[in-house]
Regions:
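Extracellular and analogous surface-interaction loops
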Residues: 54-58, 210-218, 272
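Histidine- and aromatic-enriched segments that form or immediately flank copper-ligand environments
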Residues: 20-143, 229-259, 279-290
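Conserved "landmark" site that anchors the functional core of diverse proteins
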Residues: 61, 213-218, 260-265
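Acidic-aromatic/histidine active-site loop/patch
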Residues: 148-218, 224-227
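Extended terminal and domain-junction accessory segments
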Residues: 5, 12-29, 39, 130-170, ...
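A generic beta-sheet turn/junction motif
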Residues: 225-227, 236, 273-275
Length: 312
């Protein structure tokens, strides 16, 4: 299967160094972020969307200090990681919630390499921007590739259609269901809300993220669905993708035109890039909306439109 991608080369980005994680401070606090043409006030880690990228090596320790600058209790959950339950971030079950002004030290071993993420586990806080990536390198990485990019998908309402909590209250008070939110997959129902924006790495389609590479490079994409209510169908225009990992773990490689990623899931794929500018599109399954980014290997190529063949 990999013959179609060309010969493997030594991995450059994301390679394990064997060095321990130096520690991260996650400052949960209100901040202003740009969502398309709007500037909204939301909750973030360190004023960033997504929050800081944490990198570790399988078998090593992660050290992260949560500093709660929010007007509400909070925690951090490490999504997909096998760890000591005391570090899992489930308030009322594995730890006490961290109050406003409080701190908590998360210290745990990451046993498995792969693509993971972290997020608040209190109420609707994950929907307000409290999430970030956790990439665990394999010290014996079997794949050879030139570089890697991380793609974080999200659906967004905070500061545009009220807060996520307000949107949930409106939904619970209504007896109607939007029957247009349908799919032939996922049991037919693909969500409860229409979100004003769908994001890639915190950016809306009006001001898309641009991944810059070179023609012929073999690139690993790590795709994380951090959305609360949206499954996405992902495609890279003009390319087929070799899916190599699901939820952090290696799988039998499958070459596809598109793949469907549910909430909380992660997929890794390899692709050898062509020459030009290509749309990376994540169709919101059953919602007639999309997240959009650009993969560019040529400064001469025009920016693509936010469409590609992601038929649902």
């Amino acid at each position: 299967m990999f013959a179609a991608l060309g010969s493997a080369v030594p991995v450059a980005a994301g390679a394990a160094t064997g060095k321990p994680h130096r520690g991260t401070v996650l400052r949960a606090k209100p901040a202003q972020v740009s969502i398309g043409p709007r500037t909204v006030t939301t909750w973030t880690y360190d004023g960033r969307l997504p929050g800081p990228r944490i990198e570790a090596t399988a078998g090593g320790l992660v050290r992260a200090k949560l500093v709660n600058g929010l007007p509400a209790d909070t925690t951090v959950h490490w999504h997909g990681i096998r760890l000591d339950a005391r570090m899992d971030g489930a308030p009322g079950y594995t730890q006490k919630a961290v109050p406003p002004g409080g701190t908590f030290d998360y210290v745990f071993t990451v046993p498995d390499p792969g693509t993971y993420f972290y997020h608040s586990h209190v109420g609707m806080q994950n929907d307000r921007g409290l999430y970030g990536t956790l990439i665990v390198a394999d010290p014996h990485e079997p794949l050879g590739y030139d570089e890697e990019f991380t793609v974080v998908l999200d659906d967004w309402v905070d500061g545009v259609g009220g807060t996520p909590d307000e949107a949930l209250r409106r939904l619970n008070a209504s007896t109607a269901h939007d029957d247009t939110l349908r799919s032939t997959l996922l049991g037919g129902v693909v969500g409860e809300l229409r979100h004003p924006y769908h994001l890639i790495n915190g950016r809306a389609a009006e001001t898309p993220e641009v991944f810059v590479s070179k023609p012929g490079r073999l690139v690993r994409f790590r795709v994380i669905n951090a959305a609360a209510d949206t499954a996405f169908r992902v495609a890279l225009g003009g390319h087929r993708m070799a899916v190599t990992h699901t939820d952090g773990f290696p799988c039998a490689p499958v070459t596809v035109d598109t793949f469907l990623i549910g909430m909380g899931e992660r997929y890794d794929f390899l692709v050898r890039l062509g020459d030009g500018a290509f749309p990376l599109v994540a169709e919101a399954e059953g919602k007639r909306a999309r997240a959009f980014a650009i993969v560019s290997t040529s400064h001469r190529a025009p920016a693509p439109a936010a469409t590609c063949g992601c038929a649902s």
